[in-house]
Amino acid sequence: MKASMFLALAGLALLFVVCYASESEEKEFSNELLSSVLAVDDNSKGEERECLGFGKGCNPSSDQCCKSSNLVCSRKHRWCKYEIGK
């Protein structure tokens, strides 16, 4: 009786370890996949847009704000702001 209980508990412990290991592998795989997708997305954003976003510091003589997004470099405050009315 004691031996069968010991074997049953050992079997349950082994099952728990195997399930936990496979679950952690799945999580690691999904985390790696997600991070690789986000890394590719970040790289493509950097290649597409070489301009600054709203509220970023800029130099009025070399306007790096995105004209397509109606952003201009403020000469007074030296940061990218929306150009309203044009």
Curated annotation (Swiss-Prot):
Signal peptide: 1-21
Gene Ontology cellular component list: extracellular region; host cell presynaptic membrane
GO molecular function, a single term: sodium channel regulator activity
Entry superkingdom: Eukaryota
Localization in the cell: Secreted
UniProt keyword list: Amidation, Disulfide bond, Ion channel impairing toxin, Knottin, Neurotoxin, Presynaptic neurotoxin, Secreted, Signal, Toxin, Voltage-gated sodium channel impairing toxin
S-S bonds: 51-66, 58-73, 65-80
InterPro entries documented for this protein: Huwentoxin-1 (IPR011696), Huwentoxin_CS1 (IPR013140)
Tissue: Expressed by the venom gland.
Isoleucine amide modification, residue list: 84
SUPFAM superfamilies reported for this sequence: omega toxin-like (SSF57059)
Positions of the pro-segment in this chain: 22-49
PROSITE patterns documented for this protein: HWTX_1
Membership in a protein family: Belongs to the neurotoxin 10 (Hwtx-1) family. 22 (Htx-4) subfamily.
UniProt function note: Neurotoxin. Selectively blocks neuronal tetrodotoxin-sensitive voltage-gated sodium channels (Nav). Does not affect tetrodotoxin-resistant voltage-gated sodium channels or calcium channels.
Domain-level remarks: The presence of a 'disulfide through disulfide knot' structurally defines this protein as a knottin.
Subunit field text: Monomer.
Protein name per its UniProtKB record: Mu-theraphotoxin-Hhn1d
Species whose genome carries this gene: Cyriopagopus hainanus (Chinese bird spider)
Highest classification ranks of the organism: Eukaryota, Metazoa, Ecdysozoa, Arthropoda, Chelicerata
